[in-house]
Amino acid sequence: MEFSHIPVLLSQCLDGLAIDPAGVYLDGTAGGAGHSKEIAKRLTTGRLISLDQDPDAVATAAARLKGLPAQVVQANFRETARVLDELEIPFINGALLDLGVSSHQLDDAERGFSYHADAPLDMRMSQQGPTAADLVNTLDREELTRILRDYGEEPYAWQIAGKIVKAREETPILTTLQFADLIASAMPPAERRKNKNPARRSFQAVRIAVNGELDALNEGMEAIFSRLAPGGRFCIITFHSLEDRLVKQKFRRWAQRCTCPPEQPICTCGGMPKAKLITRKPIEADAGELEENRRSRSAKLRVLEKL
């Protein structure tokens, strides 16, 4: 399948990175190489390292970055330290993470990310490890509820989990539309009528669980920040409130001076900030981009500079 990709908040990311043509940069989520290509085009003696755990994305990015000062590596961005060590790169001058599911993964029904087309219930970005079907057919009601509530902020998590457990006693839940119909059937009729995509939150939750996305984000942010050179910029695009909250909290913690417990009345840590916030509030797409690229609707960009 053709790997189509319109990079989200592209000009804002390029501005946020403040690219040095001689610098070393990391794109931790290569996808269709939309951001990577524009970063690499701005380098002269510099170098770009693009990572992606999806083998389809790696092949596409490698082809699209051919002839540019860029190298593509199949890895999750949580593995940044290992990759940079293997490439003998001690520090980088900037990094970008675009945390959205790529258009290719959504458009390729066989990957099992979409609730609009019937396909095997997969959702693995790396195409390795347990699938979404493995999770929904084996986890108990309590754990399913936790996943749907914590990762999807789904108000009907307990009811949906109950429907899943009951349904799989008769037949395994193996396809995306089978799962989507089951989710909708657990909701009150009024909720189904007002909610255009009743399966959206649950699909998000299961996808996050299958891919360990929030753990990867936490580990990846720490790994990348530790390799940023002073003055290096870190840009992260999020697409839902869970990710944005994590990024916001992490950035603020790096930018704050005092790290004493909030209940302690007097500072004793003598702490100095490790970074400064370039964006106090997240940057969102303007009207023109929203019209051109629907995927940008929920995108939020935060930018940090290491001190």
Feature-to-residue mapping (PLM):
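S-adenosyl-L-methionine-dependent methyltransferase catalytic core, i.e., the SAM/SAH-binding region
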Residues: 1-307
